[in-house]
């Protein structure tokens, strides 16, 4: 299963978010997921960033709690928001319906 973090912040907070991100990205992540990203795009409202986490089976809850704690450190940034979304592969989604390819 994948988790995707979608972050948003105003352009004026980019330096603050960037410094925090550098500190966090330098830390050794848990061994139960692989991170891809971050990727960023710029909108009229500011910056939108995406990080994708490929989570080991059975560790989804642990990964979600860990990421929630990580992203909570950004709450001091004015205008910052994050949504952590659960993404299923087509095989995982079909399995929920009792189907398979």
Could you say what each language-model-derived stretch is?
Residues 1-66, 86-101:
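Short S/T/G/P-rich N-terminal loop/turn motif that feeds into the first structured element of a domain
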Residues 72-88:
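Conserved short beta-strand edge segments in small beta-sheet-based binding/regulatory domains
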């Amino acid at each position: 299963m994948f988790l995707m973090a979608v972050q948003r912040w105003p352009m004026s907070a980019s330096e603050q978010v960037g410094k925090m991100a550098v500190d966090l990205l330098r830390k050794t992540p848990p061994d139960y997921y692989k991170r891809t990203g971050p990727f960023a795009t710029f909108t009229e409202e500011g910056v939108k960033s995406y990080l994708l986490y490929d989570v080991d089976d059975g560790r989804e809850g642990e990964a979600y709690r860990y990421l929630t704690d990580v992203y909570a450190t950004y709450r001091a940034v004015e205008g910052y928001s994050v949504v952590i979304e659960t993404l299923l592969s087509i095989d995982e989604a079909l399995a929920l319906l009792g189907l398979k390819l």
